[in-house]
Regions:
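Secretory/organelle targeting and membrane-embedding segments
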Residues: 1-145, 149-495
Length: 495
């Protein structure tokens, strides 16, 4: 059903709006989820006219449109207001424009606000939306906020208090675009629609879980931002722990947003908080140095533009989380995330316990691999007999990958997540209880790294991280399942 809504984007002149938001809204328009009864108000400091704003929108969607006319018709629903977030008069003008557009498009007073700006402005915007009666209780009112949601628990808590002054928790959608990816959402199907997995998804059968977020790129033009953030804040506090919660949660009573969210929150509340000694042993940080991949030379992190030449910011983080629940108590959830690694890829490996062998040789563990990006799908490794006269065992794989055609047809994560907001589905968004629990744990690791002399390990560009990350798994009698660097070295592609 087509949504009736006035969308207001704060930060409408920014890169995110042009690259992600306008194309995602256009796809929803093409699919009929937005049609006649919607309008978009773009606000930013730049003094744009409506006509110029429309041209920016058209340019951002032209390659998706069936015709220029279709793109222009979509863009005609867009309106622009030059806006200073600190100026009360601008909110009065915004309220008047919203009222006019609500009447023109018969939007039934439904309002969606998207804060595509730096978090320090969130509180100011929320306060003015409430004080100037733009948030007035008529129709639905929903707020989407981008990451990062704070830089630690203290700043995140203050940010949350500011938003709660104008919106209720159920109206706030903290977006994490990874949760919009097709295979992330398919984890529910893999787990809860297949008896062979759900019955063994526990500590009696699973030895360890491995989560890898690997990037081949370095920090590129984001050196200034990244040097103040690092891998732990940038990737672990949100993406990694959100994915962990989907893997570790108990089966919800029903497939509804409230039941799913309740089970996810239990995981966050059950995250084990290690002792200081355990933190030192179980969490690794690293920073890339120069290297050569496929004949291309790459500089070290400290040589990147806008990076402190003596920076101790980590570009790689690895460790072991534990969930103190009946289902997974004692099972390590290993993670690693880093820049300038061998290959881009997000993989989850569920490593099952080894069986006692009657064949006179140890058996390879069964491993369920979930491929999230760049390919999507899953595989299951099994032990089977090799063809031939002798009875020799070898692992083989049941493999399903979504082909390029199907992958291209799947919704963009932002499209899927905006669709969910319009339909009041908060399943794939972070509740404050999840955010607060994750920051409390991440803050402990950050504090240790900042004040206790924990080593910052070097790793060569093109590797899969420092040796310490591999040594960590060995302490648990495990090893990383995905090691693309081995093949690269054998092929002479790494130096």
């Amino acid at each position: 059903m087509s949504s009736k809504v006035i969308v207001t984007i704060f930060g409408a002149s920014g890169d995110l709006a042009k690259r992600k938001l306008y194309p995602s809204l256009f796809r929803l328009y093409k699919s009929g989820n937005l049609s006649e009864h919607f309008a978009v108000i773009g606000t930013a400091r730049r003094p744009w006219s409506k006509e110029y704003f429309e041209s920016v929108v058209v340019e951002s969607i032209l390659d998706l449109a069936d015709s220029t006319e279709q793109a222009q018709e979509f863009a005609s629903h867009f309106y622009y207001q030059s806006h200073d977030v600190n100026d009360t008069e601008h909110y009065i003008a915004l309220r008047q424009l919203q009222a006019e557009l609500n009447e023109k498009y018969q939007a039934e007073h439904n309002k969606l606000f998207f804060l595509s700006m730096a978090p320090q402005f969130f509180g100011t915007i929320a306060k003015h939306l409430k004080s100037e009666n733009i948030v007035d209780g008529k129709g639905f009112e929903r707020l989407i906020v981008e990451k990062p949601f704070g830089t630690d628990y203290e700043t995140a808590s203050k940010l949350n208090e500011d938003l709660l002054a104008a919106f209720d928790e159920e109206q706030i959608y903290r977006i994490d675009h990874y949760l919009g990816k097709e295979m992330i959402q398919s984890i529910f199907a893999v787990r809860f629609a297949n008896m062979i997995f759900e019955n063994v998804w526990n500590r009696e059968h699973i030895d360890n879980v491995q989560i890898t977020f690997a990037e081949r790129l370095g920090v590129e033009e984001r050196g200034g931002y990244y040097d103040q953030s690092g891998a732990l804040r940038d990737m672990v506090q949100n993406h990694t722990l959100q994915l962990l919660s989907l893997l570790a949660m108990d089966k919800p009573a029903s497939f509804t947003k409230d039941e799913i969210r309740a089970e996810k929150i239990k995981v966050f509340k059950n995250l084990y908080h290690p002792t200081e000694e355990e933190l030192k042993e179980q969490f690794i940080r690293g920073q890339y140095r120069s290297g050569k991949i496929d004949g291309m030379k790459y500089i070290s992190y400290r040589s990147e533009p806008n990076v402190d030449p003596e920076s101790t910011t980590e570009t790689f983080a690895s460790g072991a989380f534990f969930v103190d629940s009946d289902r997974f108590r004692g099972v390590p959830f290993f993670f690693r995330t880093g820049k300038r690694l061998t290959e881009k890829g997000t993989h989850v490996n569920i490593v099952f316990k080894q069986m006692d062998s009657i064949f006179g040789e140890p058996l390879a563990p069964n491993i369920l691999t979930i491929y999230i990006q760049p390919t999507e799908g899953f595989s299951l490794s099994l032990n089977g007999k090799q063809v031939g006269e002798e009875f020799n065992l070898a692992p083989s794989s049941l493999d399903y990958r979504t082909d390029a055609t199907a992958t291209g047809a799947s919704p963009d994560p932002y499209e899927k997540l905006i669709y969910d907001v319009l339909n009041n589905n908060s399943t794939n968004f972070s509740h404050w209880d999840e955010v607060s629990a994750s920051w409390k744990l991440i803050d402990r690791i950050e504090d240790l790294w900042a004040h206790n002399g924990v080593p910052l390990h070097d790793y060569k560009s093109g590797s899969m991280g420092p040796q310490a990350s591999f040594d960590l798994l060995e302490k648990f009698g495990a090893k990383w399942t995905w090691q693309p660097d081995i093949a690269y070295r054998e092929q002479g592609r790494l130096e």
